[in-house]
Amino acid sequence: MRTPELTRRRMISGTGLVAAASLTGLASRAIGQTAELKPSVPPPPIGRAERLARVAKAQRLMRANGIGAILIEPGASLDYFTGVQWWRSERLTAAVIPATGEPIMITPFFERPSVAESLGIPAEIRTWNEDEEPLKLVADFLRERRLTRLPVGMEETNRFFIPDRLKQQLAGARIVSANPIVRGCRMIKTAAEIALMQAASDITIAAFRHAWPQVRAGMSASDIDAMIGAATRALGGGYDGGLVLVGEATAYPHGSKKPHVVERGSNVLFDCGCSVHGYQSDISRSFVWGADATPEQRRVWEQVAAGQKIAMVAARVGRPAGSVDDAVRAAYTRWGYGPGYKLPGLSHRTGHGIGMEIHEPINLVHGETTRLAPGMCFSNEPGIYLPGKFGIRLEDCFHMTAAGPRWFSTPPASIDLPV
């Protein structure tokens, strides 16, 4: 459940980037021990040939759906298709991929060298100056390619000014969802993508194994997150912060603003991941520190572990994604939780899509009718939360194959051996 809205998560949980001086001495010493960790050798990054195949697939899907072109703003999809890693601002940089022919990049004149440096596919770069309208370049391109009578696809995260100003430049322009195109490509991971996600998962598990035995009484969530982050970076993963919850905060999926420190019998939750060449991991582990788990803690932990297994049995190619969530929730209801999303119980979806982004379509959630297919990747995190007491979340990701789901990380054996 490692949420991509990093600032929001830190605001809620009270966990943030912390200076070394603000860490406890125990945490600082533990971070110093990461020197013994050696970075792994990752698989190669996504190359030109794979990106060209992605563009070709997108074009086939556009033609099948009667779409003339798609406009891709900065973000994971722009990186996915072009290799350009950029940011969103009032100055438009975007790719326009037509249903046939070579794509173009639109960018400010002064940004051209930087865009050209990272562009990973053949594409003409068209520039605009500060006193010019960038959407005119898009309109002109559509006219040149004789695509003005076909709709233009845009992602649902595109900002309003883009379609609005395109319509001003191209009378009668029709804007439709690019979901059938972009999701049709990004939801199905290739072997190269799965290898990068496997590498990211391996790093996160190794970081957990390094950090778990070094948790000490008096440590804060920020202390523990800093330990995990230092280990992750030492092992070669990109890390921009995780979610660590302690005590009663574990009863709330994204934590609480109340400060908590580790003490004997504390319920502790790690929810962290990393990136390898742009691909993500997302893993959660729950355990009791410094004491044997109570019968209630052990029972809930084992029920969540059973929930993960139920999800894996339900995840079969051709079944609706929502059926996985339904299977877990039905079992939890039989065990006295819920019903549905009510508490105590499972108040969030069973899982989310994952790839270049921590959260991607589609989700393992009630009502999702998209059929599971080989290459789809998901988290499996059917946590159980007891408000005012504690919560248990175990999270491991998996990818679909024709023979069934396959784990990226192996679930833990018990609450006593959580990593």
Where are the regions a protein language model picked out?
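Active-site neighborhoods and metal-handling regions in enzymes and metal-associated proteins
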Residues: 2-6, 10-419
